[in-house]
Amino acid sequence: MRILVDARFTRTDHHDGISRYGASLIAALAERTETAMLINDERQLALLPNVPHVKVSSPLSPAELLVAAKVNGLNPDVVFCPMQTMGTWGRRYPLILTLHDLIYYEHPEPPGFLPAPVRLLWRLYHKAYWPQRVLLNRADVVATVSHTTKWLMAEKRLTRRPVRIVGNAPQNGREPRNPDASPAPSLVYMGSFMPYKNVETVIAGMRSLPDYTLHLLSRISPERRAELEAVVPPGATVEFHGGVTEDEYEAILREATALVSLSRSEGYGLPLVESMSLGTPVIASDIPIFREVGGDGARFVDPDSADAFAAAVRELELPGVWPEASRDAVRQAGTFTWDRSADALIDAAEEAIELFRARRTGRS
């Protein structure tokens, strides 16, 4: 089977969630089947596996409407796009499109790196579900990363196509920390500082944890930082890192007592999986997607209760609790692997090929 992966959503500086998802799947697929990829910028190759590639137009350009004509000439057995926006006019190949989550219907703020006209279209697009249905129904099979999103897609009737889970996963090759070594009195938050992320409640909980340091790792605007600094309780220690490298992120996680996320809404929660894979327990808000991802490797609390968050941290201090929580975290993270996701994608690809052939012959 020759799988062509649309890697044009790969960043040129550092991975974001979509970029890492695509690159990791390409690497795992290439070990299993003939794999090639589409790019639109040579700089993307620095963050992608060494597989054959073809350079085409940007997925954000008007030429996207005609990209299928270029892909037709490559004669792939099946095409996988880690987004749902790939142009399909005139396509003559089986296609899998991806919807990661429905978070932007609740919180429609577009990513800042998008051009202004695209940001406007983004907001309009997320005001109703019918545009999503139009995009997804162009595929033969639709992929998503979680059972939670699959359920939401069914609830909103977003597609008539089969929906298959091709999950996210932590990066390979990371050795978990020693569960019997005492953790540092530190807590980690990795993620944006949008209001729904509820970082204020985490900061408020530090009032009851004066012996801990809260590390806020992500990049943050000066205005948002000033807002959060203003609510740091007296005696609490909160460190704003303003962005960290991959190595710095891992080093801080390896020392910490726990990773914390009290988000009220989430698309997936990759930092939870990353933390658990290193043996660092997670304290998370009690929402469905975190229940699915965190499983037995997380402690769940009311996202509106700073006291419940602080109590969960103190519970980890009890004799024998943290070492067992660390082992539970590693076991839970082990349920998510890129090998498993690649196998699921190959199964979805075979299904897409059969459905495409059936539709071409008028049987579906």
Question: Which residues are covered by each model-predicted region?
Answer:
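Carbohydrate transferase catalytic cores enriched for Leloir-type hexosyltransferases
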Residues: M1-S364
